[in-house]
Amino acid sequence: SSAASDVYKRLRDITVQVGRTGKLTPVAELDPVVVAGSTVARATLHNEDEVQRKDVRVGDTVIVRKAGDVIPEVLGPVLALRPADAVQWEMPRTCPSCGSPVIREEGEVDFRCISIDCPAQALERLLHWASRGAMDIDGMGEEIVSRLVESGRLSDVADYYTLDEVELSLLDMGRVNKDGEPIRLGSTVAKKLVAAIDESRTRPFARALFGLGIRHVGKTIAE
């Protein structure tokens, strides 16, 4: 059913996510709760204006609504339950990923990190390129992309097309097995990934344009 369900949860923290165009989005970190059949531990707060308009503060008990498949939303605080030391939230003035100053342009609601060397933006851009609406590189998810970025092997979308099966199979996944040996990606997954990368070369140009993730260029404009 698409009926909305409301629950009351404690707002443990407000963290900041950095998107592929440098946009900073505040995220409500909640005590996990089951709403409308799924477990919710985070909800978007959109931007600083929205946080201040709703006046939600870390430590507050907040009303969380989930309707259908929509991302859960924080409606507002229960003021009667507010801790005495709760302070109004402000967007950090430096990027949580790279430490560069963030700016908010005239007439814009969003703060942005404008550093071209920001790791969080690079990761999001690389994931966007591989995503279903763009080049659709099947199996190229966040964990693998993160490891490739950390190993210095992937920093630009062109780098995808220089990856080979052997080096992918040896990619250290940052975990160890029960014998304490590093877990590697392995040849089965590597073979599938190389095939998916090759297949992505045949996508129409509009998909590549969308995959580049230029600000204000959505799928329709790209086409």
Go through each PLM region and give its residues.
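Short, small-residue-biased leader/transition segments that mark boundaries at the very start
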Residues: 1-8
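Conserved nucleotide-binding/hydrolysis modules and their immediate coupling elements
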Residues: 11-20, 24-89
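Structural signature for extended repeat/solenoid scaffolds and their inter-repeat hinge/linker regions
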Residues: 62-223
